[in-house]
């Protein structure tokens, strides 16, 4: 994820989905959203105990509350029963609204977060899910 004039763009991203997120944010019917991140890390990140990975998670944990968000949970992937996607970690980030997700790149600390993300994350798929938590 990279920032550009406080807009979110995703490498190899789904611009149609980002447009939906923007439409929801502007609709007056914005609602909480859970972003489920399926992450594959570079070997150099040292997942799960390496310094680059820990720095990335620490900065992310400091950044999300700036927009009212938080990491709900994260877990190492132990394997896959179905499919071919090779990932290291599943991370669930909750946002109070779609607008909060869009506001993240403009927050203090975002530039450092995206710098560390680029160092650590080899590939990611981020699914937008219902943000109503049990």
Indicate where each model-derived feature is located.
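Short S/T/G/P-rich N-terminal loop/turn motif that feeds into the first structured element of a domain
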Residues: 1-88, 96-103, 130-134
């Amino acid at each position: 994820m990279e920032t550009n004039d406080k807009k979110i763009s995703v490498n190899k991203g789904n611009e149609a989905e980002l447009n939906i997120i923007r439409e929801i944010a502007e609709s007056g019917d914005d609602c909480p959203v859970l972003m489920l991140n399926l992450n594959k890390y570079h070997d150099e990140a040292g997942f799960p105990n390496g310094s680059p990975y820990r720095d990335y998670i620490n900065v992310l944990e400091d950044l999300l509350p700036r927009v009212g968000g938080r990491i709900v949970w994260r877990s190492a992937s132990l394997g896959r029963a179905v499919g071919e996607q090779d990932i290291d970690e599943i991370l669930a980030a909750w946002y109070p609204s779609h607008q909060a997700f869009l506001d993240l790149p403009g927050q203090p600390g975002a530039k450092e977060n995206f710098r560390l993300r680029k160092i650590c994350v080899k590939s990611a798929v981020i699914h937008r899910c219902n943000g109503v938590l049990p």
